[in-house]
Amino acid sequence: MALALEPFGDTAWRARLPEGGDGASRRVLFEGLRALPDVVDVVVSEHHALVVLSPGTPLEGARDAIARTLARVSAALPDEPTQPQLREHRVLVRYDGADLAEVALASGLSQGEVVAIHAGTAYEVAAMGFLPGFAYLRTLDPRLVLPRRPTPRPRVPALSVAIAGPYTGVYPFASPGGWHLLGTAVGFAPFDPRAGAVMSLGDRVRFVAEGEEEAR
């Protein structure tokens, strides 16, 4: 892992991470940083790790501990004896999204092909964020990679299954959003009010088109 650290306000440090790390390695990093004293929050994305400290914690003093953890975790990853407990999620989807026809047109595919490609890909949780329980799932099939919508919607319905860039994801709650809507998750909630986010870094996710449950 890259060890370059920069202050992020007066209560946090941010480290830039190298390209190519998988979700499991990010999960190990998250758990190592979260266990440090005076750390109140850790956000690990594909490109950065943000470590938020409790108010009043000396920034420079915490830097050394964070740098040591980054170095230790990085060095241990190839032979890490304790791998994180990764889970696999199957998400049933009703492919009724408002943008399905538009995505098919932009991709040069039929709507059925879009559904088959999206549901036929295995995804990994690359990052968590944006909303509680929202998982950025990679890697979307290149045939479906599109930029975000030019004008975000003021309200995306809860449980919408959507795509943007190389990612797909499920909106846990209704919110503004600029992703392309392909469908609606059925019988799946990305956020549990008691337990928090259902998915974690490194977890695997597969979407199943409604009506094809038995085929899977």
Task: Annotate each predicted stretch with a short phrase.
Residues 1-216:
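Glycine-rich active-site loops that engage anionic ligands at enzyme catalytic sites
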